[in-house]
């Protein structure tokens, strides 16, 4: 069994293989060739018009990635939405709503449950106040959002670089600190599609992944406070030395635990759970002394049953030059008549 707070040995081995062109990656390389052929064929079908992309009547920004696993797309989406709001835009957000139990197209309301709409869309809706819709087909979500909120004049798609059925005007590609890995496609490498490929802007947490698009380095750290379900904030320094249980149901839970350690918090136990984990069957540690510490994404699922759980927000540092470049591209869209 993997140590608490660490990925499973299999996950660690595969993640390691994705960073190097070693024996395991080489063994999987023939499957990557097949995956690459299928990906190229699908793109060709859209490029030739045999499959059609639906264009919505407002500009569409897609924030996504080309690597498997967590790249930090949702915090970037939230940052983009807040920037657009500050610039006078009226943005809406569309998403597939990964991890939800429903399959229909629906609006994400602050009172929605994560089981109905997905944890990331619910977090975005509560944190931004922007209208959010989820659907398997993003274009359907966009149409429904614009019908319900006709004042919306721009859409941000959380994830969806590979969802070619939705036409887009601007693509933001996000990389974590592992970049493009060994440069191979799944399953021999982390890439969902070949890289480099044409995108408008790149945000990267590690070294530059290469490619011709303008690139901007971002950094992540935890905020200096935690918050409970009622909105009460607690300085993190007050949790130093306190008995606690940290948990994270995100793509890279060890990153969250490491950031807690960097803030001087050493939980007595750490629990790594699968991304989009359903907490309905989760059992709280029996030790009543332990304070629950979690991510914002997990809090939207934990708070209904555990309102005392302390969510630690992620502080994302994106250089102003990125937003300047974003604004410039949006201005060019406006001048071209979109």
Curated annotation (Swiss-Prot):
GO cellular component labels: plasma membrane
Keyword terms: ATP-binding, Kinase, Lipid A biosynthesis, Lipid biosynthesis, Lipid metabolism, Nucleotide-binding, Transferase
Superkingdom: Bacteria
Protein name: Tetraacyldisaccharide 4'-kinase
Signal peptide region: none
Annotated InterPro entries: LpxK, P-loop_NTPase
Family: Belongs to the LpxK family.
Pathway(s) of this molecule: Glycolipid biosynthesis; lipid IV(A) biosynthesis; lipid IV(A) from (3R)-3-hydroxytetradecanoyl-[acyl-carrier-protein] and UDP-N-acetyl-alpha-D-glucosamine: step 6/6
Alphabetized SUPFAM superfamilies for the sequence: P-loop containing nucleoside triphosphate hydrolases
Record-level Gene Ontology MF annotations: ATP binding; tetraacyldisaccharide 4'-kinase activity
The protein's Enzyme Commission number: 2.7.1.130
């Amino acid at each position: 069994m993997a140590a608490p707070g660490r990925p499973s040995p299999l996950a660690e081995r595969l993640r390691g293989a994705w960073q190097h062109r070693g024996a395991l990656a080489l063994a999987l390389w023939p499957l990557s060739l097949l995956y690459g052929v299928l990906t190229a064929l699908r793109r060709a079908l859209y490029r030739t018009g045999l499959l059609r992309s639906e264009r919505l009547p407002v500009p569409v920004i897609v924030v996504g990635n080309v690597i498997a696993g967590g790249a930090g797309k949702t915090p970037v989406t939230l940052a983009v939405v807040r920037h657009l709001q500050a610039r006078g835009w009226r943005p809406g957000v569309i998403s597939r709503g990964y991890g939800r139990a429903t399959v229909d197209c629906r609006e994400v309301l602050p009172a929605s449950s994560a089981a109905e709409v997905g944890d990331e869309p619910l977090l975005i809706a509560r944190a931004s106040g922007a209208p959010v819709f989820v659907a398997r087909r993003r274009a359907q979500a966009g149409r429904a959002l614009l019908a319900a909120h006709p004042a919306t004049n721009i859409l941000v798609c959380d994830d969806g670089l590979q969802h070619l059925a939705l036409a887009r005007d601007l693509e933001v590609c996000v990389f974590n600190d592992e970049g493009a890995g060994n440069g191979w496609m799944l399953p021999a490498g982390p890439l969902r599609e070949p890289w480099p490929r044409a995108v408008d802007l790149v945000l990267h947490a590690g070294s530059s992944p290469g490619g011709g698009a303008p690139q901007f380095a971002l950094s992540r750290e935890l905020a200096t406070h935690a918050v409970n379900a009622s909105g009460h904030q607690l300085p993190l320094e007050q949790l130093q030395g306190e008995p606690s249980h940290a948990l994270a149901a995100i793509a890279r839970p060890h990153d969250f635990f490491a950031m807690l350690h960097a803030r001087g918090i050493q939980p007595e136990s750490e629990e790594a759970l699968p991304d989009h984990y359903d907490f309905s069957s989760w059992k709280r540690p029996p030790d009543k002394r332990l304070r629950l510490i979690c991510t914002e994404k997990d809090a939207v699922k934990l708070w209904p049953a555990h309102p005392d759980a302390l969510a630690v927000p992620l502080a994302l540092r994106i250089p102003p030059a990125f937003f300047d470049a974003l604004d410039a591209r949006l201005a060019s869209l406006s001048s071209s008549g979109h």
